[in-house]
Amino acid sequence: MPSDRRPSQRRNRSKSRDYRGARSKVTRADTRNRDDTLALSMYQGPPSADQGNNMADAPRFGFWTSVSQCLQYLWARRHLGLLLLLFWTLVILFRPVNTAKLPILAEAAELEPPLGNMLDFFFPTACIIRDNQVVVACNNQPYLSESECLKSKCCSSTSGTIIKCYAPVRDKPTQVLRVFGLAAISILVLGFLPMCCCSMCWRRKRMNRMLKVLKKQKSKGKKPKGRKASEERALLSH
């Protein structure tokens, strides 16, 4: 009887050793497969001929495609309306205006304060008379006193001119500098805004791709228990 038990115990020990060895082989194979998948995801090697044809058939991501995608994203986020509103305000501000039809400073002061301030900014005036400038009497009264002239927001002249109180003259150098500065700032803003939008969209796409890769790796790492058991049985049978 004890002699019969000893070979059975030896057989059970040999079976347990074989089972442990097969299980260790399965775990090693799983770790190798995971390392291979990680290496393939990090570096897939140079593209083959079939991959090159597929890449040629696939849509190419260029500057205009990124711009169109950014515009679609902005339209979905309802930010494109604000950009269009800003663009049309700039167009209205920089449209050509006939200076002969503009009112004088006294009439502009009677307008609303925001519009009057805007006209003062884009069409500044000064009391300095430059060469070949026509002088107009203040309120059609050229012989007003200095106090009345200042009350009417006009310029008084103490030199030997015919008109002692005249309306302010257009300051063209200051106007050119202001318009040029505002145009330069608006061009810079409108130039960098699409670039910023494109960079934001590109970063978002890159983050989405990275998240997709991580999800795929996690899904590959989490294998079902039934599949592991079938692999262990197959190795034990061999």
Curated annotation (Swiss-Prot):
Extracellular side: 101-178
Transmembrane regions: 80-100, 179-199
Biased composition (Basic residues): 214-227
Membrane topology per record: Multi-pass membrane protein
Ranges per topology, Cytoplasmic: 1-79, 200-238
Residue spans of biased composition, Basic and acidic residues class: 15-30, 228-238
GO cellular component, one term: membrane
Annotated segments matching region Disordered: 1-30, 214-238
Domain P-type: 118-176
Compartments where found: Membrane
UniProtKB keywords: Membrane, Transmembrane, Transmembrane helix
Chief localization: membrane
InterPro entries registered for this protein in UniProt: FMR1-like
UniProt protein name: Fmr1 neighbor protein
Gene: Fmr1nb
